[in-house]
Amino acid sequence: MESEIASEFLPFCRIYKDGRVERLIGTDTIPASLDPTYDVVSKDVIYSPENNLSVRLFLPHKSTKLTAGNKLPLLIYIHGGAWIIESPFSPLYHNYLTEVVKSANCLAVSVQYRRAPEDPVPAAYEDVWSAIQWIFAHSNGSGPVDWINKHADFGKVFLGGDSAGGNISHHMAMKAGKEKKLDLKIKGIAVVHPAFWGTDPVDEYDVQDKETRSGIAEIWEKIASPNSVNGTDDPLFNVNGSGSDFSGLGCDKVLVAVAGKDVFVRQGLAYAAKLEKCEWEGTVEVVEEEGEDHVFHLQNPKSDKALKFLKKFVEFIIG
């Protein structure tokens, strides 16, 4: 007999009374491949045996035939999915990172992290931080992964992520800036359609609709981060809150991308404005695509606007 449903958090998942979690979207996977058909090869490597977590690496095929002196920009990518769905192995992210690596001629490391509800926030942040340290352990050329040892330019390290991954990217750069003794030098972060929120709208143009605001709050408070003391004003979610300070952000430049129809658009713009006003000495670039919705560049990657953003993202990495 099928288990009884305890709760549903549409469109993401369904939780049964026996504790089983059924993800309703974002579950498809595609294998890594050393086939150079698309000019990019990929492979999976475990970085956290204790949690059975891997990274998926993407490398331009031509680089596999070159010497160790062929150093490439390194993109550490953090997928989105409301802290609940998706992975580096989904077609959505595999195909996107393939295009980014092909266009930017960079090495990309796409990070798997534990997801809610089985492992609620802050597990995802802890895992990504662990992965970043694992990646930087290759900076002296003696790490466990040859691709990183041979091809990563640790003077050109970028973090990038969309939605929840954009949120995590910001917090990782903040942590890198704070943990100076670790010497994790990050050149820039790309914060794409970041999932930032709060109890109150950031301005008069932010989402005012109570049903929408309560729906996002429910996802955060009941499934993504049920242990948050302050609900949607948790500093991990409400980065634009009055108590936040970006002056210690550990990177030189930030690309903030927002979409006009996205519920997070005003939060993203407020984030960029706060960066520009604080004592952080880096540079901020804002890319706003009117008439588009959340992660449109992933959902419709061949559209003119998606290709336009891909070009901007690539310029950010190689510029």
Curated annotation (Swiss-Prot):
Q: Which residues carry this modification: N-acetylmethionine?
A: M1
Tissue specificity: Expressed in roots, leaves, stems, flowers and siliques.
**Any one annotated GO CC term:** cytosol
Q: Name one GO molecular function term.
A: carboxylesterase activity
- What is this protein for, i.e. what is its function? Carboxylesterase acting on esters with varying acyl chain length.
Family annotation (SUPFAM superfamilies): alpha/beta-Hydrolases
Q: Which family does it belong to?
A: Belongs to the 'GDXG' lipolytic enzyme family.
Record-annotated active site:
S163, D262, H294
Q: Its domain of life?
A: Eukaryota
Q: What is this protein called?
A: Probable carboxylesterase 5
The record's section on Pfam families has: Abhydrolase_3
EC number(s) recorded for this UniProt protein = 3.1.1.1
Catalytic activity reported: a carboxylic ester + H2O = an alcohol + a carboxylate + H(+)
**Gene transcribed to yield this protein:** CXE5
Positions of short motif Involved in the stabilization of the negatively charged intermediate by the formation of the oxyanion hole: 79-81
Keyword set for this entry? Acetylation, Hydrolase, Serine esterase
